Amino acid sequence: MVLIKEFRVVLPCSVQEYQVGQLYSVAEASKNETGGGEGIEVLKNEPYEKDGEKGQYTHKIYHLKSKVPAFVRMIAPEGSLVFHEKAWNAYPYCRTIVTNEYMKDDFFIKIETWHKPDLGTLENVHGLDPNTWKTVEIVHIDIADRSQVEPADYKADEDPALFQSVKTKRGPLGPNWKKELANSPDCPQMCAYKLVTIKFKWWGLQSKVENFIQKQEKRIFTNFHRQLFCWIDKWIDLTMEDIRRMEDETQKELETMRKRGSVRGTSAADV
């Protein structure tokens, strides 16, 4: 049995713009989560081609300890809180799988994303069979809705309801921004449809951990896309060549940061 949710994130940018914005923001957010022996280690970042699909393959290791809830830390053996993330980015479709060597086949997180030029109105964009699709909970994330943000995560300079882009003049996003976007032919629009499938097979803990992970994924998607929009002036003029160069630099920075300093970034809100 697995727990499946589809998160829909509407943004006032084009699918083409988002490709650069997403990669820029991933690199920046990785730095904010790395330090003191924890965080993100990039093993591979290279082009791939398989079965007619072309894109960028990444393999990252997440060193987590303080970033999981206390009830998991209590039962997790030393060294088991290391997770492997493999991602195939054949934009506008992306697939990410997170595994753990200690739990082997009893655990995975799979995130499949389609980026579409609409306002999140497409149904079953991932083409699931009807019986599976009936079990999927759809969650709409509004990047301008402060009530969807954990109080500890809130930053005024990463609030789309307050931010206005100098370069694009987009923002601030009011309470009815999605309706306004639908009626504004001049402003681009898109939706990230993120299908998250979670398996955690551990007697007595399965539903608690699966629900915790889904809650954390929503938190990550919400914070990440708020940042992405508020950082638009930093990435809107970048090319994919700029991004690849930045990723190489970030990979080296992360290695240094992880080995030094104190633990940084998001910690687990216990459930």
Swiss-Prot record:
Q: Where in the cell is it found?
A: Golgi apparatus; Golgi apparatus membrane; Endoplasmic reticulum membrane
Residues carrying N6-acetyllysine: K215
This protein's encoding gene? PITPNB
Q: Annotated Gene Ontology MF terms?
A: phosphatidylcholine binding; phosphatidylcholine transfer activity; phosphatidylcholine transporter activity; phosphatidylinositol binding; phosphatidylinositol transfer activity; sphingomyelin transfer activity
Q: What GO cellular component is one of the record's annotations?
A: cytoplasm
Organism whose genome encodes this protein: Homo sapiens (Human)
- So what does mutating K60A actually do? Loss of phosphatidylinositol transfer activity but no effect on phosphatidylcholine transfer activity. Fails to rescue the retrograde transport defect from the Golgi to endoplasmic reticulum in PITPNB-deficient cells
What is the protein name given in its UniProt record?
Phosphatidylinositol transfer protein beta isoform
Query: Which reaction is recorded as catalysed by this protein?
Result: a 1,2-diacyl-sn-glycero-3-phosphocholine(in) = a 1,2-diacyl-sn-glycero-3-phosphocholine(out); a 1,2-diacyl-sn-glycero-3-phospho-(1D-myo-inositol)(in) = a 1,2-diacyl-sn-glycero-3-phospho-(1D-myo-inositol)(out); an N-(acyl)-sphingosylphosphocholine(in) = an N-(acyl)-sphingosylphosphocholine(out)
The protein's matches in Pfam families, at most eight in alphabetical order, are given as:
IP_trans
GO aspect biological process, one term: phospholipid transport
Q: Does the keyword Transport apply?
A: yes
